[in-house]
Amino acid sequence: NAFVKGADIGWLPQMEATGYTFYDQDGTEKECLQLLKDRGMNSVRLRVWVNPNTDKASGHCSKEETVAMALRAQKMGMRVMINFHYSDSWADPAKQTKPAAWATHTFSQLLDDVYNHTQEVLNALKTAGVTPEWVQIGNEIPGGMLWPEGSTNNWKQLGQLLNKGYDATKAVDKNIKVIVHVDEGNNNTKFRTFFDNATSQNVKYDIIGLSYYPFWIKKDYTETIADLEFNLNDM
């Protein structure tokens, strides 16, 4: 397979809805994905929120919009990754807020919610003619997801939630590669702690995903790049 060169384009519909236009270096207006493809990008990552609001500036990443964006990318020959946040808005290391519709659900219901939402979105994509190459279960989840039930304070429950996402994905297409994703890719201790616990709970996945943002680490990348290399090799 070709080396993956991609980007998360989840904000593109928001930018287009609020009037952004994109231009080539010579001043010619072009569609954003075409500009990216012209520069060698061959893959996109699309995030999915459960019930986002409808504000044109912040209310994006619904199932319907994700399907539309995936189709746009596929028609340009790009490979597709779907990133499930299991939230109505951003989920990240600082917040893993349950969707409002799931807020009062029992843990047993949350297991069904994860399975059904994952399967529903992937089936909608499949019906539209798009089968993603990768599916990410949760977004930057060193502390778990769907707090508090899916916190890393309760690995037994977190493991079950992650496996529900895996099982739903494979039920749609067994060839989709499932990713589990943690931030701060230069921090081997964080990754060892997370994935050793995941192994102890028999969490199923195909790929370890990591983020590495020197800007947020607050150090020059030259101070942490060797740590990133060590962690990649260790994982």
Residue ranges: model-predicted function:
Residues 1-79, 85-114, 120, 136, ...:
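N-terminal substrate-binding region of glycoside hydrolase catalytic domains
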Residues 59-67, 91-199, 203-205, 217-230, ...:
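Active-site cleft segment of glycoside hydrolase catalytic domains centered on the general acid/base Glu
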Residues 14-15, 50-53, 142-144, 214-217:
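A short, flexible beta-alpha/helix-coil linker loop
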Residues 48, 180-182, 212:
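Short glycine-centered, acidic/aromatic-flanked micro-motifs in structured strand/loop junctions
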Residues 85, 170, 213:
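Histidine-centered active-site/metal-ligand motif
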